[in-house]
Amino acid sequence: MRRTTYAGLVDEKYLDQEVCLKGWVQKRRNLGNLIFVDLRDIEGIVQLVFSQEFNPEALKVAEQLRSEYVIEVKGKVVARGEKAINPNMRTGKVEVEVSDIEILNKAKTTPFDIADDINASDDLRLQYRYLDLRRPEMQKALMIRNRITQTVHSYLDENHFLDIETPYLTRSTPEGARDYLVPSRVYPGHFYALPQSPQLFKQLLMGAGYDRYYQIARCFRDEDLRGDRQPEFTQIDIETSFMSAEEIQEMTEGLLKRVMKETLDVDIKTPIQRITWNEAMDRFGSDKPDIRFGMELKDMSGAVRNAGFKVFDMTLENGGQVKAITVPGGADKYSRKQIEEKQEYIKRFGAKGLAWVKVTDDGLTGPIAKFFTERAEDIKEAAEAKSGDLILFVASNRKVVADSLGYLRVAIAKEMDMINKDEFAFIWVVDWPLFEYSEEFDRYIAAHHPFTMPNEEDLDLLETDPHKCHAQSYDIVLNGYELGGGSIRIHRRDIQEAMFKALGFTKEKAEEQFGWFMDALDFGFPPHGGLALGLDRFAMLLAGKDNIREVIAFPKNSKASEPLTHAPSTVAPKQLDELYLKTDVPEEDE
């Protein structure tokens, strides 16, 4: 039988028509001479009716049905009785009286229910991912992802971008995250690397005159995982020639506006707000600020200076900061014990303590209130606090203050349900530092990557005082997540060489690793720039998920393994011999 429509699309317009449907048994209810079956497919669920009255043979077959059996049915669409109508379903006003049925395949009892609400561990879900993906919630998430990619293709094609693929097997660059390496059989002892991004290839395409490039690009990074990271991920990769940073941002806003409208029917306001990196750190304590709620960081230095509280005074004397966040209504919400728990929380960001006062009609209360009896109004004004609020202070250097209060701000907002989860708040963070200090490497590294162009007014500093340079770079942030980032690129060899020198490369090291690229810059590269948007993260946010695994068909778990296929795995000794490889694995890791 040829399928005539999808189960989830059968509604009143099919009344009195005969349909042929195919799908999975969601559930069965046996009332003796009457059996009801919910048939599920990619579009949804429709109710089937088997009756002794209109087909005894079909009823007998229906008695054999169990959950997840695959069936095809033929029958007539009829209206449900008034009391049987389900207003929550598209198909809720109709049902199909089945005249013919065939069981296409049987199914064992599944390890968890094929339903949105399930009680299963992440690894069990990944082990049986093909079952997990049957759940309507998962199908909806992947449909959102598909809608994003289709809209991206359409928008960029309309704007004269060329979809060009770049290599997966390329050269390792041992800067930044670890590469995934692929041994070469043809060149023993040599390795390809899977690309962490198509960065240099897309810049070469600009040098080749292709003007506007894009790619839905797979990228690979061998790094520790967290909720919004995977060892292999996908980005919407874009590069353009002869466009300024502002023009690239405007083009990106058009793309975001189209995606939001066509995916969720949400209108976003453009132009999107822009703030500098310095402003983001000062106001929100984060370079990816969530602007759906207030509770911004406030500089309390003037209000608390020389009031007699030694912690604050010594911090300010040593060039540090005293900042605070004001928790609306927090005076009654948070007990002393709960505030002490917050103090333990911020210690992970380097803070040594969390000072606090509660604002009352009579002034301030709390452990440090006695130092500020005469400053109560100054503190309330600086913190923008009113009676009933809780003011939380951190005193330290700029980074510790920003990190501590920035993370605390978000944690408290979640606890107090201050965040509108239906809101999509985009913001650009621009004018980044060109370099940032890495505690892991104990040196300065490129804040984005070493191919980022410094601001024009900072070009001289690249040779004399590079750590004061700012970059022509920009990040687009959505609801506190870095959705993507980009920059104007270096298109001149002399600037690229100066950049490598500032990063500590010797001339020989720069030539060995990137000489092939710098040689290309000698042949008339145009000014160019671009950005990359994280497709997985974008889909996660639009689908309302907390983990990108929920919008990837076959992801890895938090240990970078795949419970379904048991990857990574050992390989046959013959395969290693062909690659001239030997393994030396500690016993505890085997």
Swiss-Prot record:
Q: Which PROSITE patterns does this chain map to?
A: AA_TRNA_LIGASE_II
Q: Which GO terms describe its biological process?
A: aspartyl-tRNA aminoacylation
Pfam families given for it? GAD, tRNA-synt_2, tRNA_anti-codon
Cellular location(s): Cytoplasm
Q: What is its main location?
A: cytoplasm
State the Gene Ontology terms under molecular function: aspartate-tRNA ligase activity; ATP binding; catalytic activity, acting on a protein; nucleic acid binding; transferase activity
Q: Which GO terms describe its cellular component?
A: cytoplasm
Keywords for this protein: Aminoacyl-tRNA synthetase, ATP-binding, Cytoplasm, Ligase, Nucleotide-binding, Protein biosynthesis
Q: Give the region (Aspartate) as residue ranges.
A: 199-202
Q: What is its EC number?
A: 6.1.1.12
Residue sites binding ATP per the record: 221-223, 230, 482, 534-537
Q: Which top EC class is given?
A: ligase
Looking up InterPro entries in the UniProt record yields: Aa-tRNA-synt_II (IPR004364), aa-tRNA-synth_II (IPR006195), aa-tRNA-synth_II/BPL/LPL (IPR045864), Asp-tRNA-ligase_1 (IPR004524), Asp-tRNA-ligase_1_N (IPR047089), Asp/Asn-tRNA-synth_IIb (IPR002312), AspRS_core (IPR047090), GAD-like_sf (IPR004115)
* Record: residues binding L-aspartate: 175, 221, 448, 489
Q: Does the keyword Ligase apply?
A: yes
| Catalytic reaction equation(s) | tRNA(Asp) + L-aspartate + ATP = L-aspartyl-tRNA(Asp) + AMP + diphosphate
Quaternary data: Homodimer.
Q: Which family does it belong to?
A: Belongs to the class-II aminoacyl-tRNA synthetase family. Type 1 subfamily.
The free-text function statement in the UniProt record for this protein reads:
Catalyzes the attachment of L-aspartate to tRNA(Asp) in a two-step reaction: L-aspartate is first activated by ATP to form Asp-AMP and then transferred to the acceptor end of tRNA(Asp).
PANTHER family for the chain = ASPARTATE--TRNA LIGASE, MITOCHONDRIAL, ASPARTYL/LYSYL-TRNA SYNTHETASE
This chain belongs to the protein called: Aspartate--tRNA ligase
Q: Which organism is it from?
A: Ligilactobacillus salivarius (strain UCC118) (Lactobacillus salivarius)
